[in-house]
Amino acid sequence: LMSCDMAVFVTPLYYYNVSSQLKHVIDRFYSFTGELTARRLKTAFIVAAWDDNDWTMEVVETYYKTLCRYMSFSDQGAVYGTGCGSAAMTRRSAHMREAYELGRSLK
């Protein structure tokens, strides 16, 4: 993480937040917060959820934005994939195109 150009955090949505696996990785940042914050690392965020309610991603979106603010990450974009509970659902959604466009926009 200290030598990469960018980090992309990808997770399924579990009870309106990131998975425990991703949370564990983020919690490990604590031991080198100062060094990581000084890097102003570029980041992106991709989340997939079965639900497609308009409020489904509110908590996880706030979590990611707060993490970026606290860690001085440079947010390059996010894909909040609601209605993506299976591969077929995801293919029918607009979120595949959103992820593609996010990737194309990165410099």
Specify the residue positions occupied by each region the protein language model found:
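Glycine-rich phosphate/pyrophosphate-binding loop and the adjoining helix
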Residues: 65-107
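Helix-loop-strand module that forms the ligand-binding subsite of alpha/beta enzymes
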Residues: 1-71
